[in-house]
C-alpha cells in the first residue's frame, strides 16, 4: 500500500484522442485526490487540468512505418529522456495512453525499475501483430480496454485487463442536436452539409487531402446544392488543407473551422472521414459516413502482411459486420469516394442508426470513472494523516 501525502502519476498521451482520454482520467482522479500530480507528455486538455508536459505531444504524432523510421532518432531520444525523468520521479504509477509502439517499450523499462504500469487503450493485438500480447504482459500491470471484445482476448492470455467503455460514448448524447450544432457554427439550418475530416496529423492530410478535395468536386456534381464543412485541428493543418484546395479545386467552396470536429459532425447530414477514433465519434453522433484511408505504399505493404482482420473502422469492428463503407489504400480514389458518399446520402439510414444506438449503449460505461477506480485499486493508495 502506498503511504504518502500526494499521489504522483506519470502519463504519456501520443495524440489528440489520447489527450481527451488523459484529461478525462485526470478529472476523475482529481475528484478524490485533488492534490495529485501529473507529469509526462500531454496535450492542451490535460495541461488545462494542471498536467506538466516534459515534451510537446506533437513529438509523438507520427503515422505509418516509414514515417516513424524517419523520426526514430528523435523518438528514441524522447523515450530515453522520459525513462530518466520518470525513474527519478518515482511515481505511484505510469499510465501510457494509446501510442503502443512508443509507450509499451517505455512501460517495459519502467516496470523493470519497480514502477507500476498501466496501458490505457488496448493495442489492436486482435487485428495485427498478435504476438505483441507477450510483450504487453511483461510491460504492464494492467490494460484498460475501451472495446468489449478486447477483454476476452486478454483473459485468454491471462493478462490483467479491465473493460472501461469509451469516454466518447459517455460525453456524446444518445441523440445529437443538428440544429444546435449548426447554430454554434453559424451554418444554414436548411442546407445539406457534408462534413469532410481528412485527419488530425500532417501525414494523414498529406495522403488524404487531395483525394478528399477531388471527391468533393465530384460530389458537388451529384448534389449541386450540397455544402462542405471541414474542421482542422490547428493552423498548420488548416494551411495544409487550404493548399490542397488551392492546388486541386480552387473554385470549390469549403467552410473551414478550427477545432470543433464534434460540432461539425453533428451539424452534417453525412460525413467523409479518415479511419481512426473519429469514426467512433461519427458513429456515436449517428450520421451516415464513408471511411477512407491510405498510407505510403511501403507502410501498406508491410501492414497488410501483418493484418489479422479484414475490417478497419471502429463501427464495423464493433458491429462485427460492414455497416459503413471502407475505402482503403487503392480504393481511396476520388471516384470511389464520391460514389460511396452518394450511396450513403441516398440510402435508408434507419437500420444503421439503430445499430449505432445499440453500440452506443454498450460503450456507455462512465469510462473515466471506471478507469480511475482501476488505477487507484492498482496503486492501493493510502494518505498519511
From Swiss-Prot:
What is one process in the GO biological process aspect for this record? lipid A biosynthetic process
CDD domains, A to Z: Glycosyltransferase_GTB-type
Q: What class of enzyme is it?
A: transferase
Which EC number(s) are documented for this chain?
Answer: 2.4.1.182
**Highest taxon above the source species:** Bacteria
CC terms in the record's Gene Ontology section:
membrane
Record keywords: Glycosyltransferase, Lipid A biosynthesis, Lipid biosynthesis, Lipid metabolism, Transferase
- One Gene Ontology MF term: phospholipid binding
Q: Which reaction does it catalyse?
A: a lipid X + a UDP-2-N,3-O-bis[(3R)-3-hydroxyacyl]-alpha-D-glucosamine = a lipid A disaccharide + UDP + H(+)
Give the pathway annotation. Answer: Bacterial outer membrane biogenesis; LPS lipid A biosynthesis
Q: Name one Pfam family in it.
A: LpxB
What residue stretch is flagged as signal peptide?
none
Q: Which family does it belong to?
A: Belongs to the LpxB family.
Biological function: Condensation of UDP-2,3-diacylglucosamine and 2,3-diacylglucosamine-1-phosphate to form lipid A disaccharide, a precursor of lipid A, a phosphorylated glycolipid that anchors the lipopolysaccharide to the outer membrane of the cell.
Give the protein name, as stated in the record: Lipid-A-disaccharide synthase
Q: Which gene encodes it?
A: lpxB
Amino acid at each position: 500500500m502506498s503511504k504518502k501525502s500526494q499521489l504522483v502519476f506519470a502519463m504519456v498521451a501520443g495524440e489528440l484522442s489520447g489527450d481527451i482520454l488523459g484529461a478525462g482520467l485526470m478529472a476523475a482522479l482529481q475528484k478524490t485526490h485533488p492534490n495529485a500530480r501529473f507529469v509526462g507528455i500531454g496535450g492542451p486538455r490535460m495541461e488545462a487540468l494542471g498536467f506538466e508536459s516534459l515534451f510537446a505531444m506533437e513529438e509523438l504524432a507520427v503515422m505509418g512505418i516509414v514515417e516513424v523510421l524517419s523520426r526514430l532518432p528523435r523518438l528514441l531520444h524522447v523515450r530515453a529522456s522520459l525513462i530518466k525523468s520518470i525513474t527519478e520521479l518515482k511515481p505511484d504509477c505510469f499510465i501510457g495512453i494509446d501510442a503502443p509502439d512508443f509507450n509499451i517499450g517505455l512501460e517495459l523499462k519502467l516496470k523493470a525499475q519497480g514502477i507500476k504500469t498501466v496501458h490505457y487503450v488496448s493495442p489492436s493485438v486482435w487485428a495485427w501483430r498478435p504476438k505483441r500480447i507477450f510483450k504487453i504482459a511483461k510491460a504492464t500491470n494492467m490494460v484498460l480496454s475501451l472495446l468489449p471484445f478486447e477483454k476476452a482476448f486478454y483473459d485468454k492470455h491471462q493478462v490483467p485487463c479491465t473493460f472501461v467503455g469509451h469516454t466518447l460514448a459517455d460525453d456524446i448524447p444518445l441523440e445529437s442536436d443538428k440544429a444546435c450544432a449548426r447554430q454554434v457554427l453559424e451554418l444554414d439550418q436548411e442546407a445539406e452539409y457534408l462534413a469532410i475530416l481528412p485527419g488530425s496529423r500532417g501525414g494523414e492530410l498529406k495522403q488524404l487531402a487531395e483525394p478528399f478535395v477531388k471527391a468533393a468536386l465530384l460530389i458537388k456534381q451529384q448534389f449541386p446544392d450540397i455544402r462542405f464543412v471541414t474542421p482542422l485541428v490547428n493552423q498548420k493543418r488548416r494551411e495544409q488543407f487550404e493548399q490542397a484546395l488551392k492546388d486541386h479545386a480552387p473554385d470549390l467552396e469549403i467552410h473551414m473551422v478550427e477545432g470543433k470536429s464534434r460540432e461539425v459532425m453533428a451539424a452534417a447530414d453525412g460525413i467523409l472521414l479518415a479511419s481512426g477514433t473519429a469514426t467512433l465519434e461519427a458513429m456515436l453522433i449517428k450520421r451516415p459516413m464513408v471511411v477512407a484511408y491510405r498510407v505510403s505504399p511501403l507502410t501498406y505493404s508491410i501492414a497488410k502482411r501483418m493484418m489479422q482482420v479484414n475490417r478497419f473502422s471502429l463501427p464495423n469492428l464493433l458491429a462485427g459486420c460492414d455497416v459503413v463503407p471502407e475505402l482503403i489504400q487503392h480504393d481511396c480514389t476520388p471516384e470511389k469516394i464520391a460514389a460511396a458518399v452518394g450511396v450513403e446520402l441516398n440510402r435508408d439510414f434507419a437500420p444503421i442508426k439503430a445499430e449505432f444506438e445499440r453500440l452506443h449503449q454498450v460503450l456507455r460505461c462512465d469510462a473515466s470513472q471506471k478507469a480511475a477506480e482501476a488505477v487507484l485499486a492498482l496503486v492501493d493508495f493510502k494518505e498519511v494523516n
